[in-house]
A protein has these predicted regions:
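Single, function-defining residue in the core of a domain
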Residues: 1-8, 12-26, 30-172
Length: 172
């Protein structure tokens, strides 16, 4: 079991910690929803222990704390859309790391190639679409998009009773 767990991806996420009461309002930040702090954590599921963490004001965006993670070659990282930064994603790929996240709905991508469901290990019942995609915009806001032209993989899976989940999975 330990060997199998060693192949699990690292998990990167944050959670707000609400702090209310006399004395807290003077020094804790308010993000419109929570007054308190935010814990950013990188977990290793193989050990069940945090690998890295930081505690910030509740107003700090998740992507601003991505620096707590030093990518390892061959490692896989899973994180949510709060860590959307195409240039950071390019750095992960350059370091030889992989990642899985959800693409934002406004991500400007084009499909390069469709993969037939018969190419999957399963019967295709849970995988609705498997595609290689490429970012089409050279600029991301006011800065260059270092993911432009790189091939990424987008997989859409079914979830009974819920909307399909679209995952973007990028390798090196």
């Amino acid at each position: 079991m330990r060997k199998q767990a060693g192949d699990l991806p690292y998990l990167l996420d944050s959670t707000p910690i609400a702090l209310k009461g006399r004395g807290f309002d003077q020094w804790t930040g308010h993000n419109g929803r929570i007054t308190g702090l935010k814990l950013h954590i990188l977990m290793n599921p193989a050990t069940g222990c945090p690998v890295a963490h930081s505690i910030t004001d509740a107003r700090v965006n998740d992507v601003d704390e991505r620096h707590i993670m030093q990518p390892e070659k061959g490692a896989t990282y899973v994180f949510d859309k709060g860590y959307c930064d195409y240039n950071w994603w390019a750095k992960l790929g350059e370091a030889g790391a992989y990642f899985v996240t959800r693409l934002k709905t406004n991500a400007a991508v084009e499909v390069v190639r469709h993969i037939k469901p018969t190419e999957h290990e399963n019967t295709g019942e849970t995988v609705l679409a498997d595609e290689y995609i490429r970012f089409t915009h050279r600029q991301n806001s006011s800065r260059p998009n270092r993911c432009h032209g790189k091939i990424l993989r987008r997989i859409t899976v079914s979830r009974p009773g819920r909307e399909p989940l679209v995952l973007g999975c990028v390798g090196n």
